[in-house]
Regions:
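Beta-strand/loop edge motif enriched in small/polar residues
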Residues: 1-267
Length: 267
């Protein structure tokens, strides 16, 4: 079936069920609509590499306004929402466009197995956050996120993350956007540990001075950047004594290039 799917409201994958999305599928979400993955439910996106500019094998999630004026308008629909206990989600060759939040991840399933495993995923033009993970457990390879109103990737309330060969850009155009936010803060409870979080051969670069924003409360904030490009233009040395940004600390930053101005080390 070559026809696209149009979703009104939030479609929900029931518990213990798996939604399998075949290569080339197009899903259009109406305003205030999205996809919910229930506890013990699974999302399997089987997109594949394409041979033409038509992206014939790519899976695409976007809004239902197809006029050219809406091609890059953020916030046209809601989110792909992974509820607590959702697990074993495998996502390949998926593009998400013009959502409010591309992926919302609410807690992992409490096991060492990643809640979400992604490869060749692209997320563009989200009104708030590309991936908002709250105590998530995620892995990603060849992930690209760009142009988000708050952050491209937000790893909040701790969790565990592993990203390789990824680009977290943000050229939203105003002053308060980040490519990456990481925090172990939990507003309502004690801080939640962020453990075993790794970024390997990744880019964090955008139109604002700071590509990353890190926040540590009591508890653990365990992260490492390996061979990454990070934009961090601290013109007034406001973070000079903050240990989270000690780029010479090889327990946190190994082989990284730090873009300390806007004219050198541009990707």
């Amino acid at each position: 079936d070559d026809k696209p799917y149009v979703v009104y409201g939030y479609a929900k994958i029931p518990e213990t069920k798996t939604l399998v999305i075949d290569p080339g599928t197009r899903v259009h979400f109406h305003a205030n609509s999205g996809l919910i993955v229930s506890e013990n439910a699974h999302l399997q996106v089987n997109g594949d590499l394409s041979n033409t500019e038509l992206l014939e094998n790519e899976v695409i999630f976007e809004g239902d306004r197809l006029e050219p004026n809406y091609a890059d308008v953020a916030g046209q629909w809601g989110a792909v929402w992974f509820l607590p206990g959702s697990n074993g989600n495998n996502i390949k060759n998926l593009t998400i466009k013009n959502a409010t939040v591309g992926m919302l991840v609410s807690n992992n399933d409490g096991t060492p197995t990643p809640t979400i495993d992604m490869m060749n995923v692209q997320i563009y033009n989200c009104a708030n956050v590309g991936i908002l993970a709250r105590t998530g457990n995620m892995t990603g390879k060849n992930v690209v996120i760009n142009n988000c109103g708050q952050a491209s990737l937000a790893c909040t309330y701790g969790g565990s993350y592993d990203f390789t060969h990824c680009t977290f850009a943000n050229f939203w155009g105003s002053q308060n956007q980040y490519c990456l936010i990481m925090s172990n803060n939990n507003i309502n409870d004690s801080p939640t540990n962020l453990t075993n979080t790794n970024f390997k051969n990744c880019i964090f670069y955008g139109s604002t001075n700071f590509g990353i924003g890190l926040e540590k409360f009591s508890g653990t904030l365990d992260y490492k950047f390996n061979n990454c490009l990070i934009k961090f233009v601290d013109t007034y040395n406001q973070f000079a004594t903050n240990p989270l940004y000690t780029f010479s600390d090889t327990s946190k930053y190994v082989g990284c290039i730090i873009a300390t101005n806007t004219t050198t080390n541009i990707p």
